[in-house]
Every structure is written in structure tokens, then in C-alpha cells.
């Protein structure tokens, strides 16, 4: 093995450790609630820069990425990344408060610095992450999901095992759970984590893998039943609709979906019982309303699983045509009902669905108010600010300037638009929003062209879920770095298998040689123990170092 190959192998191991630290360890990193936002931001900022600089140093001394990893001239995704970065820098330089926009002080630390370090992390992962890490990384995300969910449930019932909220009033804790803090941040994590966890269970073969990925899926069903956020329901629903349209959707997939449905209805029924018999602080998730029919739903899922398991006797029947019809009916039906509910005054009430379909200032826990004032603030800006924005994190300031003396107490509570795309329009302008949509479209187009390659489907579903979730949520430092790393992983998985790509073609008239014996693959423990250990250690070290490096932010 040449020195360049050794350096490339070290870089691949480092990129794996980086992904473990960011996707599995970082969601569990926490400090006191009063500093939760800055603690999470400074820790992940230090982590991303540390790994990006380390991988950059390896590249400088000879660790050359595989061919096709960073094709600057042909790849529109890289140009889109440059556009996103430049638009963020320009909008920060022209911001209402450049210093606040650089650090994101006015908007959950989602400022220019986050754009810069996530771009660096994206390039580092895309350059060196190995294609063979999906199964282990997915299992790690599943373990993290289970831990986050359990802590979330315990905090709902006022049980704080790790003392995180010891200094926080009980009334405040009603809105803050687990290690990610506020419930909407938890829903953002679950929006991309649950599709990875559920997909691994859907495609698992054999008893060992089914049980291995079934345990995180069981806790994923619990997360769906307890995480109090409409965005999670929207994100998971969008991912399911995309899954139904794929050729891989068969009776076997439906059977596994029935098992996941059984997990969900079991937990929803249990939570309904607990809410009626035990005091809880948490709100009531939209999906938890199905707890009223928890027993019926569980039995229906069990019956569906039994029919598909025993009646078909192991045969797999394609269902993607039916799935596409169902997805089309759901989308068209939702659009028609929304239009009728909002535009036809005499349209009959649909009960609780009215809270979802009818848009007004009270929609989605006053998200309607946030959307209205954000749009009005953008329309009130001069043309050049419409194009370039008021600066990252400046939504609250822009709204205050627009409303003036007419600002209400409700308006004062919003530091984000609760719609990532609408907030980008205000803070980075038409240019910034267009750059981000270009970046997203370039990646999803590449995913559609390479859907059948290993790893593409689960990562795409995770990103689709997050992008749908972002319609009614906010971009924060707790979640966005992981999303950028998933975009980078998607590009890695879309490439042809690199083992086949590096095989040398034999000469035209050369004598045929016997194929070399395949290299012995290391065991799972030997393969994953070093990156897991390194990832956890780096997360701990970067978390501690961030308190010193970014002391001025605390």
C-alpha cells in the first residue's frame, strides 16, 4: 500500500469518525438549559472546523480523494454550495447588524458562521467518507434516537436522570425535553433520523438484522407518538408518500410498515392512558390523537401483517402502482380540501382538521402570525434588500422596524419565521433563497437518477422529511449541520462503487490472470470501534474546547 493510499484510508476513517460524532454523539451533548443554544452551536462549530482542518491537512500532505468526488467543473451541486455560501456572506456584510448576523445571535445561532462551517464539513465528508458506512452509521443513529426518545418521555413525566434542568422552573420545563432542548428541535432531529431508522428496518433481511434494526424502530414508533410538533408529522408523511411511489414498494415493504404502525399504535395507546391517569407536563402531539383508537389501530396493523405474512407465503407482489395512486389521491385531496376550507366560506366544518386546513393568525400555535409578519416585513423592504436580505438572524429586528409602535406582544415573541424558506427570503433575500433551492434541487435530481444505488434511498427520504418539516419549522444549529452532512453523504452514495472503479483494465492482448482472492473484511467490532471511540472522544474534546474558544458568546 502506497503512502497516498494509507493517507486516503486514514482520511476515510477520520470522515467516518466525524459522521459518528455529528450524527450520533452531538445530539446527546448537553449543558444547562439557560445556555443550551450557545452550547450546542459552539460545540458543533468547533467539531466541524476541527475535522475539516484535519482532513484538509491530510489532503495537503497527499491524501487524494477518489476520482469523481469533487468534480468542480461538472457538478452543479458544488456550484450551488458556492452560491449558498456567497449569498450568506453578502447578506451578512449588508445586514442590519453584521456582527449579530455573523454569529446568528438574533436567530438561534443560524448565522453566517453556521453556513461557513457546514460548507466546510460538507466538502470534507464528500471528499473522503467511505461508501460502506451506511449500515453501521444507521444503527448508531438508531441508538441515539432511542436514547433521545427515552429522555424525552422521562422529562414529560418530570423525571430528569441527568440533572439537565435542575435550575429550570417546572413551568419552563413543560416546553423543553431531552438533550436537544425545545420540542421543535427534537422534531427536527426525528424528522431526518426516523426515516433512516425505519428504512433500515424495512429492508433488513434475516432474523439478526431484523431484530438489530427493529429495536430502534420500536423506539421510533414511540417518538412519533410523543414528540409534540406538527412538523414531524408533515415530514414523515412526505417521506412515506415518496416511498410509496418507488418500485421497491412491495407486499414485503407493506408488511414491515404494518409492524412500524403496530409500534406506533401501541405507544400512542399507552401515552393516551398515561395522559388520562398520570400527570404530565407536555403538550399533545397531533399524531397522539390516534391514541383514542390505539387498540383498534394495533389490531388492524397486526391483522394486515398476518395476512401478508401467511396468505402470500413469502411471495413479494409489487405495489408501487397502487402506491402512486394512493400518493396522488392524498396530495390532490389535501390541496383541494385546503383550497375549499380557505376560499369557500360555506364549506362545512371538518372538526379537528379545521385546525390544520384553515390558515389564519392562530394556525400552528400562532405560526400564521409569524408567516404574515415575515412576509409583510419583506414586502416593506427596498428592492436591494428584497434581493439580498436583511441579514441572517435579523427577522425579529426587521419585524420590529416594520411594525414600529403597532408591534404586539405576540409579534415580540417571534425570533424566527417558523418557515425556513420564508425566513431565508427575508434574511438572505431572493438571491439566498434561490441559491438554497438550487442546492436542494441539484441533490434531489442526482438522487432520483441513482435511486437504486446502496444508501441513496434512505438518505433521500431523510432529506425529503426534513425539507417538508422545514415548511413549518426553523433552521437551527442543533439540526442544520447534520442535514448538510447528509447532503454530502447523498453525493457519496450516488457515485459508482469505487472498488469497481479503481480496478485496472487488462491490456487488450494480455494473458488472462486468475482473479485475486477478495481481501478479508474486518469484523464489525474491529471496523467500528475505532471511529466510534474517536467520534465520541472528539465530541467531548470539542465540547470542552468550545467553552474556551467561544467564551465571548457565553
Language model features: what each stretch is:
Residues 1-9, 62-74, 283, 311-323, ...:
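Membrane-interfacial, low-structure loops and terminal tails that flank and connect transmembrane helices
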Residues 173, 371, 388-391, 414-422, ...:
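Alpha-helical membrane-protein architecture signal
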